């Protein structure tokens, strides 16, 4: 299981390296899954949203905009149990990021702007 991020799909300008590496993990995971499709190896990608952890300090762990860690873990475990063949594990909180590009360029750009503005406010 590889762990990318919702920010692999809509980058946060204040953390460009983090977002770029998570996008690379997403790309790598897709390629690896394709390369191993004729084997018994399952390649799964976990795509977390913004989660309350101490990754960037205590402030992040208490940020009300972030998903509580226990909620995230509970939802991930539920998905793993109910969808054992899932190639991507996406909790509902990450859907806006994961599927932003599918909304079209104009909506994507608006979402990108709103996301980045909200993190600076």
Q: Where are the model-predicted features located?
A:
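Rossmann-fold scaffold of SDR-type NAD(P)-dependent oxidoreductases
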Residues: 2
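Short, flexible catalytic-loop segment of classical short-chain dehydrogenase/reductase
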Residues: 48-58
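Residue(s) in the substrate-gating loop at a strand-loop-helix junction
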Residues: 5
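Active-site helix of classical SDR
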Residues: 21
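C-terminal helical subdomain
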Residues: 45, 61-105
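Active-site-adjacent segment of SDR/Rossmann-fold oxidoreductases
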Residues: 10, 31-42
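Non-catalytic terminal and boundary segments that flank Rossmann-like NAD(P)-dependent oxidoreductase
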Residues: 107-121
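Active-site loop immediately N-terminal to the catalytic Tyr-X3-Lys motif
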Residues: 12-16
């Amino acid at each position: 299981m590889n762990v990318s991020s919702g920010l692999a799909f809509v980058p946060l300008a204040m953390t460009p390296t983090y977002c770029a590496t998570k996008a690379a993990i997403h790309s790598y995971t897709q390629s690896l899954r394709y390369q191993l499709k004729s084997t018994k190896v399952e390649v799964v990608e976990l795509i977390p949203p913004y989660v309350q952890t101490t990754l960037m300090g205590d402030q992040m762990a208490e940020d009300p905009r972030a998903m509580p860690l226990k909620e995230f873990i509970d939802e991930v475990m539920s998905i793993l149990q109910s969808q054992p063949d899932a190639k991507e594990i996406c909790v509902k909180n990450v859907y806006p990021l994961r599927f932003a590009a599918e909304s079209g360029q104009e909506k994507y750009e608006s979402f990108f702007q709103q996301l980045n503005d909200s993190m600076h406010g």
